């Protein structure tokens, strides 16, 4: 699955171990990293040099739309993510603490849209972020010939398609 992404492939064990330590799905972590780093091609995946040292940020934590490389690298520096391993573990810790460990923001959809408090505490600004991430995850599961087990479906008042 990552054979054509050597930047991530050489850190497969780090993703697996970070996932285990933070009780996060490893397929999700890798998919999230692929999405946020443009399939591991961005500067944040390959290290951004600040003051003679490289910093990494695989999940786009702290990366603002105004200058995602600069702000993402500054966040990585502030948190000591000066190796890919530290960035993988640190990012997984951030995602777990600030999103997945909260019942109201533990899905891709709720991370992006925050239905309980729309417009506040959202992981991403891209309106297709949750869908794009879900598609990458679905492709991984399809290639592994398995299916996800747990789904949370949000149903809105005027959503005839999903009404019971």
Regions flagged by a language model, labelled:
Residues 23-24, 81:
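Structural motif
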Residues 13-17, 30, 89, 93:
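Solvent-exposed, polar/charged alpha-helical surfaces in well-ordered, non-transmembrane soluble domains
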Residues 1-14:
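N-terminal export signals and maturation junctions of secreted/periplasmic proteins
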Residues 15, 35-67, 151, 161:
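Cell-wall polysaccharide-cleaving catalytic domain and substrate-binding groove, primarily
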Residues 59-164:
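Non-catalytic cell-wall polysaccharide-engagement segments
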Residues 24-40:
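Short, functionally critical alpha-helical segments immediately adjacent to catalytic or ligand/cofactor-binding
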């Amino acid at each position: 699955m990552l054979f054509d992404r050597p930047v991530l492939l050489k850190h497969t064990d780090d993703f697996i171990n970070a996932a285990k330590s933070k009780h996060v799905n490893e397929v999700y972590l890798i998919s999230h990293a692929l999405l946020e780093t443009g399939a591991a091609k961005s500067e944040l995946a390959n290290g951004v040099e600040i003051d003679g040292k490289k910093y990494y940020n695989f999940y786009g934590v702290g990366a603002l739309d105004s200058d995602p490389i600069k702000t993402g690298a500054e966040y990585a520096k502030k948190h000591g993510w000066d190796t890919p391993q530290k960035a993988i573990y640190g990012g997984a810790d951030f995602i777990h603490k600030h999103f997945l460990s909260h019942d109201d923001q533990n899905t891709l959809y709720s991370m992006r849209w925050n239905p309980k408090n729309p417009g506040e505490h959202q992981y991403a600004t891209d309106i297709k972020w949750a869908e794009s991430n879900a598609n990458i995850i679905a492709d991984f599961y399809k290639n592994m010939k398995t299916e996800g087990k747990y789904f949370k479906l949000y149903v809105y008042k005027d959503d005839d398609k999903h009404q019971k």
